[in-house]
Amino acid sequence: MKVFHGIDRLPAFRHPAATVGSFDGVHGGHSELLAAVRRFARERDGESIVVTFSPHPRIVLETQTDLRLLTTLDEKVWLLERAGIDNLVVIPFTREFSRTGSADFIRRDLIGKLGVETLVMGYNHHFGHNKEGDYGSLRSSERPTLRLYRIEPFSVGGEKVSSTVVRSLVEHAEMARAARMLGHPYLLMADVARGSLRIDDPYKQLPPAGEYSVTADGVPVRLFIPSEGAPHLDRPFTKEKSIIEFTAL
């Protein structure tokens, strides 16, 4: 997967099919979107694109003081690449960018700069200044060059999957339910020095203090999350960018 930071100097993508969003957690609902994007790209022998934002818009707009995120940008890149996406475009989210109207975002950025031909949206996705744009507003506008598709809600056990629901599960140490909603184990990407984890993103969602069964790059270990101080493993190994996955018991 190719990763691009910014939208002003992009290559010409081949018949691109895209989706846009924060994709926090890259959960089961997101997987439905990603599968559709890949499918529509293949129909035209094109490329799949995910457009996301960094930092998370809520951080910049300060709309939620206690915000915690399921995935850091590095974790998101790892999960999207594993999902088979061809290209990830990371738009730097600023207060100035937040004032971009929905029509400008579609016309200037998605169509003008990325050349998007097919756009796949979640059922509740909003975009543009004050979240003024959505699937309905796009359907009613005249965009003859843009194919538009909407993905309906995705549920597990009768419950709609969302990043908010998964955050609550992780917060309450319900790691097995979180994994079912995500479609993969909850994970941390961290630098490990003599067993101690360094997590640079202060917004990363961690489960509460306790002892957890995890794998570190596929090796079963125990993870200890203290009330204070850094999380640490029961083995004193050192590795940059280690993938710590919670075992769903």
Language model features with spans:
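N-terminal catalytic cores of NTP/NDP-binding nucleotidyl/phosphoryl-transfer enzymes
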Residues: R9-T72
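Residue-level signal for inorganic ion chemistry
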Residues: H27, L80, L119, A178, ...
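Phosphate/ribose-recognition catalytic cores of enzymes acting on nucleotide-derived substrates
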Residues: A193-L249
